[in-house]
Structure formats: structure tokens, C-alpha cells
Amino acid sequence: MVPLVRGAGGSHQWLAAVLLGLCCLLPAGRLAAPGGDFPGAAADSLVVRKGDTAVLRCYLEDGASKGAWLNRSSIIFAGSDKWSVDPRVSIATANRREYSLQIQDVDVTDDGPYTCSVQTQHTPRTMQVHLTVQVSPKIFRISSDIVVNEGSNVTLVCLATGKPEPSISWRHISPSAKPFESGQYLDIYGITRDQAGEYECSAENDVSVPDVKKVKVTVNFAPTIQELKSSGVMLGGNGLIRCEGAGVPAPVFEWYRGERKLISGQQGITIKNYSTRSLLTVTNVTEEHFGNYTCVAANKLGMTNASLPLNPPSTAQYGITGDAEVLFSCWYLVLTLSSLTSIFYLKNIILH
């Protein structure tokens, strides 16, 4: 509403006539019907965006001496006398007949009915303009980032203002970008780890671009080991076992050979832990390093493990490794040559 104050100039008789005429035309405080009752009225309603300039058109008839603008029952202008203290309002006069009201930087408080009254030779004639101020959507409240355990029920809230009232929609920002039904509240029942991530709330009313805000949902779950794999090992060489895991919070990894916990930096063992994997390296492999290795992953929600044997090379299945294999080959060659010599010797005896 435009703030008002009584002007210092103008004819009191003219103002009295205007108010009296309005009282007669608007019994019991009711407003005149939209559309006015004199020619030259451009429109009976005006829609503008908040912050824009509104021009409420009104024109004087031939023979009309004065005009007045009122906001509900309060006078804004009487003729050229300004009764409002609001610096945003003025009279727009593109020609001698125009008597339009201009409001700069309109706000929602300016919303409502305005009446233009024109003094003719006989009686005041009026026209009403209803000003509607549209407001861009604005999200004023959204759920904070949350951390929940897998299987919990989650409710996200997004509240927005605007005129017209904005519609609210949600979507999960993921490779599938799954949309949800519109509404201020988004309910997720029995949330899973795949439903973790950012959720986007969008408020839209076609006045301007949608207002968008995001909330992050973190889903805790117990660790899982997805892969346990080793590289080939040889005596005197290096061996590597890789343990791939997942969990939120990130799991803590430990290693065991048999029942014994392994410590990085001891007995040629090096362990490097990352958020989703652990690497165990064995330097200068000896027979003592062979055995069953277990990777353990744990966080506050649980623990899991997986085991893998670290065995000698495939030749070890015959009990032959390293220098022994060379000796065995030499011995086998000697036996073979000896057998051939014996055969030739027997053949000569028979022939002779």
C-alpha cells in the first residue's frame, strides 16, 4: 500500500466532492466494478513483477477538469497535488488527457485495487484498476545435509515463497537423474546406499527462472570386500595382494597370515591402506611368507573378511624349486645316457 499524507495545496471542495462521489458510487465501502464507467479506460487489471514499474492508465474526458487517484479509500493524488509521501509514485502525463499513476519498484505491499476518479461537469466518474504484483520463487528453507544408516526412513523438506505460489519438485542427482513427485516433502523409505548423494529442490512459478537448492544425503553401510587378488610370486621375488572394499564410513583394513596380525615394515611386509583398498607387498619372498592371508575391513557398522592362499610357483607341486630342479635335470640326463649305452652294448653282444 502506498503511504499517504494530506497535501498542502488543492481545493478542499474538490476533494470533498471526490470523496462524496466515491461514497455514493461505493456504498458500504464496496469498490466499483472493474472496467470503469467512462470511455478511455485502458484496462481493469495490471500484472507486473516485483521490482518493475507499474503504470495504471487513466484518461480525462473532454470537459473534465480534474482527476484523482485513490488506493482503496486513501487519496494518492488529487489533481496535480500529491498526497502520498512515497517517492516511487508519480503522475504520468504523455498528453493533456492522460492522468495515469506510475509506481516504480513495485512491491507486494502495492498489490490491490486502485481507483481513478475524474471530475466532469456533472458528477465524478470512476475506473478501477487491480494491481497484481508477481514475485519470483525463493526457497527459504531446505533440509540440512544429513547422515543416515542404510535402511532408515528419510524425509527431506523444501519450502518456498512466491506469487503465484511456486510448485516444488525434487530429483536425485545421479547418472539416472531420477525425478520424484512434486511436493514440499520428499519421503524415502528404507534408503539404500545407491540412493546416497545430492538431492535437488526446484521452486518454479513461471515469473522468472526457478530457484534451486541442494541437500546432500550420506548413507552409512557396513563394509564389503569386493575383490581379493594376488600376483604371481617366486622365491626371492616380490609378491602383491590387493584387497578392494567398500563401506561408509570408509573401512579400516587389517591383514593376517594365519592367526598372526601383520604389521607394515616387519618381515619384509609393506601395507598401504586407502579409502577403498589395501595393498600388501611382500619383498624378497621366502618359504616363510607362504600361507593363508586374510584381509579384514571394519567400520562402526560392522566387519567383514576374505582369505587367499599365497603359494609357491606351480613347479612347487612336484617338490622341485630353484637349484634342485637343475640337479634333477642333470641326474635325469645321466640316467638316459647310461640307458642308451647299455642298449648299444647288448646289441653288439647279440650281433657277435
Curated annotation (Swiss-Prot):
One of its GO terms (biological process) is cell adhesion. Its main location: membrane. The keyword Glycoprotein applies. Expressed in embryonic retina, telencephalon, tectum, cerebellum and diencephalon (at protein level). Disulfide bonds join 58-116, 158-201, 243-295. InterPro entries: Ig-like_dom, Ig-like_dom_sf, Ig-like_fold, Ig_I-set, Ig_sub, Ig_sub2, IgLON_domain. It is a lipid-anchor; GPI-anchor. This is Neuronal growth regulator 1. The gene is NEGR1.
